[in-house]
Amino acid sequence: MGLRVAALYDVHANLPALEAVLAEVEDAGVDLVVFGGDLVWGPWPGETLDCAEALGERACFLRGNCETLLLDGLSERHRWARDRLRPEQRTRAAAWPLTLSLDVDGLGSTLFCHATPRSADEILTPASSEERWADALAATEERVLVCGHTHLQFDREVGGVRVVNPGSVGAPTRRPAAWWAVLGPEVELRATDYDTEGAIAAASARVPDVRPFARWLRDTPSDDERLADFEAAT
């Protein structure tokens, strides 16, 4: 019998959002929690990783594009977040894999990655062409793929592969909430409400500039707006 898995992607160090989701995860009866990348870049880097790692062996971690940017310290915001991870946390984050394959109850062999199986920063959305999807999935043996990166929650089939994006826990699309998914035996797309204004107030006391974080939660783009931005960039 396969596993029942919670997929938590793009937390972006939004600790209040993660705590709200984990309270529901405990009631969901899952065997594993997969953190699908872009976990530690945001207002609460070290605290967010501590919270996730408190799950012990039930937690699995993937490296997203923001982990690479953060650890490389390519911008002031990335360096700020990096410096709020303890050295041993940075070492562990640098070692997170890019992909993970699990046997999920009812779904079978399922591949988890941050963006696509071949890249942690490739942009593919529901509006992307079948040809682009087929090219990105050409080497994928699994018939179910769980990916994030775009913060767009969806469940679709492309060329015989079921593609699930759980959405973003910490930087939402559609409405201010924490978006995630449970897999096994079905795919359950979920959204958890929490006190977003309280999160902004708490973040303002610790980050140099709270405005980007506040925009994530107050000026939440629609799916169409996010799609238009991504497709214009590809």
What are these regions (language model features)?
Residues V25-V30, L55, V104-G106, A138-E141, ...:
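Glycine-rich phosphate-binding loop signature in dinucleotide/nucleotide-binding domains
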Residues S75-R79, G106-T140:
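Active-site-proximal segments of metal-dependent phosphoesterases and phosphodiesterases across multiple
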Residues A127-P166, A178-W180:
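Anionic-ligand binding region
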Residues E157-T234:
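Acidic, His/Gly-rich catalytic cores of divalent-metal-dependent hydrolytic chemistry
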